[in-house]
């Protein structure tokens, strides 16, 4: 067994301890508030997008092509002592994760041990592949180990990106949702949403199309809520002004996904709105946009909603 497969096997071991609790009744939420730009501490005159937020809300990962990186796109991190505090200056995640190629679209597992991201580095199968890294200590943002490619069950000769791991408490399954432009529902060059199940031994099973979330247009960067009842993604499907943020929901993890709906004009704009990431608290949504009034090209924004019990 290769070192990479031994590391993948850790996923199965870790998930055994994670899929034990039972979620309560699904809460209801208000509409999303007007988004706010994360400001010049986080955003730069360059492109900043692909946000990922830690479960405790204290570490914000994202990718940027700002100066000071190792390649065309690097993953950066900003930290704060408490959720009520301002974000600190972004720091490059370092040479263990970043390379002279392009690293982007980070995503953290619910337990914080795994970092999934997209890379064009050598050793991949296609244009872009999904990689994963492990850390022992979930509060050590610079403790990531050497990443490895998820292999042909997930990656292809095409563009594969935006992994989002769902650890399903009710069914005991672990599922990796991601996007790919391999031949699917759309024509050449369009993106669909796929899912790969993690087997009990930690290995990924061959990915399959998620038809409820895919369309003849491009559907990208799924972000699955940790309880599995909502998935956010961005799309240029009919009903979008360009690239818009969309959402699909379901009552239980055993139900099919609902027909996706546009999250609306409060969040989306006539510009390019993309790369959504739903936080663990289920009330905070990060995304990127190049709408007027930003700091650079693509900027990071946040919108919030309040919770009201059924």
Go through each PLM region and give its residues.
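Bacterial N-terminal signal peptides that target proteins for export
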Residues: 1-10
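Bacterial N-terminal signal peptides
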Residues: 9-19
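Short, conserved micro-motifs composed of acidic
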Residues: 23-310
């Amino acid at each position: 067994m290769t070192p990479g497969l031994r590391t993948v096997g850790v996923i199965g071991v870790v998930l055994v301890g994670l899929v034990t609790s039972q979620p309560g009744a699904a809460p209801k939420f208000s509409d999303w508030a007007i988004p706010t730009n994360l400001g010049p501490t986080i955003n730069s005159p360059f492109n900043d997008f692909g946000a990922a937020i830690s479960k405790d809300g204290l570490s914000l990962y994202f990718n940027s092509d700002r100066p000071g990186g190792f390649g065309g796109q690097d993953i950066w991190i900003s930290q704060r002592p408490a959720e009520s505090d301002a974000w600190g200056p972004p720091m490059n995640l370092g040479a263990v994760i970043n390379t002279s190629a392009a690293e982007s679209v980070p995503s953290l597992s619910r337990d914080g041990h795994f970092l999934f991201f997209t890379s064009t580095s050598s050793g991949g199968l296609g244009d872009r592949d999904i990689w994963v890294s492990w850390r022992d200590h979930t509060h050590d943002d610079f403790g990531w180990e050497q990443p490895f490619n998820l292999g042909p069950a997930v990656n292809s000769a095409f563009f594969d990106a935006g992994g989002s791991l769902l650890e399903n408490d009710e069914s005991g399954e672990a599922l990796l949702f991601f996007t790919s432009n391999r031949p699917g529902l759309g024509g050449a060059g369009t993106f669909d949403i796929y899912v790969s199940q993690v087997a009990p031994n930690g290995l990924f099973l061959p990915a399959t199309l998620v038809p409820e979330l895919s369309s003849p247009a491009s559907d990208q960067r799924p972000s699955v809520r940790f309880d599995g009842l909502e998935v956010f993604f961005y799309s240029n499907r009919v009903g979008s002004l360009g690239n818009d943020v969309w959402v699909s929901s379901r009552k239980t993890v055993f139900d099919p996904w609902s027909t996706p709906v546009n999250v609306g004009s409060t969040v989306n704009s006539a510009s390019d709105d993309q790369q959504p990431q739903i936080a663990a608290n289920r009330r905070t949504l990060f995304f990127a946009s190049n709408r007027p009034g930003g700091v650079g090209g693509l900027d990071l924004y946040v919108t919030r909603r309040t919770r009201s019990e059924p």
